[in-house]
Amino acid sequence: TLYWVPSALAIVSNWNVFDFARPEHLQKILFAGEVMPVKHLNYWRRYLPDCLYANLFGPTETTDICSFYVVDRNFADSDSLPIGRACNNCDTFLLTEEGTRASRTGEEGEIVVRGSFLADGYYNEPEKTAAVFTQNPLNTAFPERIYRTGDLARLNEKGEFIYISRKDFQIKRMGYRIELGEIEAAAGSIEKVKSAAALYDADTGRILVIYEGSIKDTDEVLQQTADKVPPYMRPDEVIRIKQMPYNANGKIDRQRLLKEYCGA
């Protein structure tokens, strides 16, 4: 069994490692911690088709994995991978901005978790604890503690959660609510783009896409990204870098990118 963050799996596919050697002994490949780009998943499935692949979701505050999706069908490179359904002994649902439980295909909301394994809260941070560990607003009959993850998702036609982005990764510009995660996913799905990050420069109101890949023409990446998102989500600028920075957890170092390209 292999349990990695998607960024680590992407390194293998970006460097075409399986052209030289393949871990044929692997039976299960699990990933969690960030969004898994489908084009990288497809690379792994192409070379190791007999493995079981599972996308796991579980914030630190839940102390365990709370939902999972076992890959059971084919996806196009531009598709989004579900994070599945709740594990045993817990429940996950989407809480809409109106305070209702999302139930229709395409409906969006914040991922909420309830169950016996929720953390007690944040050490010496009572205000932060009270903001996200709250009473279930859908249950007025008795006390029921929930954790509001701050992650946004939508329901697909199968009732599975499709991850969108963090709530703090959401911006409003020109009257539109924009999910930077969708822009990032669109850019990252482009062939020959190894990884991409969407940033918002609050000082200038501009959306930037930073990418690593072999496409030298940034206008080409800009146009392909724009073709995959609504007009109001079109990036203002695309920048190519030699190597995407990663933090100690193997995730894209957004703070470093913001500091370097947005002056944050």
Can you annotate each of these PLM segments?
Residues 5-7, 33, 212-214:
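Structural motif
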Residues 1-6, 30, 112, 117:
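Short intrinsically disordered, low-complexity coil segments enriched in acidic
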